[in-house]
């Protein structure tokens, strides 16, 4: 019912002479209706449980997968816009929710306004958005400067490295950049490289540090 109502509402907002035409939004809504992927009534409370949305049966770069992520991030935006800022003190900040988007490069190549808002609004609302991708070039999107909003970049071993992204993320150049690239190429299983914010603030040592993670 809600899906059809959204399509009807969008049609009503169009000029009268064009209400019978099929545009991009109506095309997506029509596919959502035909695939019957949403329940008639939304009863899921996204911030009070752990949910995995499996998009495996949809084309990763297709309109359906993008639409599902679009609607979920829109719902999260609506929730967090109503919340007060996160609680903080001298040592800690409140974390309310994590959203992890795997293979995020599929969601960075178009104007994904809900995702952009989620990152921008969520930063002081206790909302953490983790964008996982093997292609760091994707963060230099023409639609939104995602990596400029990356407070805690975590770099795993990868062969394809983008000098521009690494420079912007870690504030390095010249010899320091080459050392960082060598460190990334030499990472082992379970090892990550992240910013060393204390070293950056003090202007001492390297701008990055290596950490090792373990399975719990």
Segments from the language model and where they lie:
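P-loop NTPase motor domains
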Residues: 1-127, 140-142, 165, 175, ...
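Hydrophobic/aromatic beta-strand patches that form the interior of the parallel beta-sheet core
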Residues: 51-53, 130, 152-154
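Active-site-proximal loop/turn and secondary-structure-junction residues that shape catalytic pockets
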Residues: 57-59, 135-137, 160
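Conserved H-loop
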Residues: 124-127, 132-138, 157
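ASCE P-loop NTPase helicase motor core
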Residues: 139-144, 170
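A short helix-turn-beta junction within AAA+ P-loop NTPase domains corresponding to the substrate/partner-engaging
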Residues: 143-157
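Conserved AAA+ ATPase core "coupling" helix
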Residues: 161-169
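C-terminal alpha-helical "lid" subdomain
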Residues: 196-198, 204-216
């Amino acid at each position: 019912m809600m899906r059809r109502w959204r399509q009807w509402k969008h049609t009503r907002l169009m000029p009268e002479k064009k209400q019978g035409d099929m545009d991009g939004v109506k095309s997506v809504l029509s596919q959502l209706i035909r695939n019957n992927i949403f329940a008639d009534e939304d009863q899921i409370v996204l911030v009070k449980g752990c949910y995995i949305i499996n998009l495996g049966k949809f084309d990763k770069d297709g309109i359906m997968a993008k639409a599902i992520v679009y609607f979920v991030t829109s719902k999260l935006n609506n929730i967090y816009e109503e919340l007060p800022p996160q609680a903080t003190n001298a040592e800690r900040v409140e974390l309310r929710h994590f959203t992890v988007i795997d293979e995020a490069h599929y969601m960075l190549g178009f104007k994904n306004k809900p995702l952009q808002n989620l990152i921008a609004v969520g930063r002081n609302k206790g909302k953490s958005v983790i964008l996982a991708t093997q292609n760091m070039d994707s963060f230099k999107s023409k639609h939104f400067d995602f990596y400029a909003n990356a407070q805690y970049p975590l770099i795993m071993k990868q062969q394809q490295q983008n000098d521009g992204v690494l420079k912007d993320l870690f504030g390095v150049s010249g010899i320091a950049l080459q050392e960082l690239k060598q460190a990334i190429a030499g990472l082992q299983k379970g090892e990550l490289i992240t910013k060393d914010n204390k070293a950056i603030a003090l202007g001492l040592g390297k701008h990055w540090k290596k950490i090792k993670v373990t399975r719990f």
